[in-house]
A protein has these predicted regions:
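Amphipathic alpha-helical assembly/interaction segments
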Residues: 1-119
Length: 119
C-alpha cells in the first residue's frame, strides 16, 4: 500500500469515526455536564480528521509535522472524553467501548506517524 492509498483510507476512517461520534453525542443524556462533555468530544473527534486531512495536504515537512502534532493532541483528547464518559458512569454501552477502542487505535496510528518525524 502506498502512502497516498494509506492516507486516503485513513482520511475516510477518521471521517467515519467523527460521524459516529456526532451521532453518539446526539444520543447522550441532556444533562448540563454531558452537554459540555459532548461538545468537547464532538470538537476533538472532528478536529482529528480535519487535521489529518491538513497533514496530508501539507506543503513542507515542517507544516506536516505541525499538523500531525495537532492530530495527535486531538486524538488523545477524544480518548480522554470517551474515557471520562465511561468513568462518570453516564454510559457503559458496547457503543462507547467500541468508540474507545477505535479512538485508541486512531491515536496509536497518528502517534506512530508523528514518531517517524521525530526520528
Amino acid at each position: 500500500m502506498t502512502n497516498e492509498e494509506f492516507n486516503e483510507g485513513f482520511r475516510k476512517r477518521t471521517r467515519t469515526f467523527a460521524a459516529t461520534i456526532i451521532n453518539y453525542c446526539d444520543d447522550l443524556p441532556s444533562l448540563p455536564s454531558m452537554k459540555i462533555v459532548s461538545y468537547q468530544l464532538c470538537k476533538s473527534s472532528t478536529s482529528t480528521g480535519a487535521n489529518f486531512r491538513a497533514f496530508c495536504r501539507g506543503r513542507s515537512k515542517n507544516e506536516k509535522y505541525a499538523k500531525i502534532c495537532i492530530t495527535v493532541e486531538e486524538a488523545d483528547e477524544t480518548v480522554y472524553w470517551l474515557e471520562l464518559i465511561l468513568e462518570s458512569g453516564k454510559d457503559d454501552s458496547s457503543r462507547l467501548h467500541t468508540s474507545i477502542q477505535e479512538s485508541t487505535e486512531i491515536l496509536k496510528i497518528v502517534a506512530k506517524i508523528k514518531s517517524s518525524f521525530d526520528s
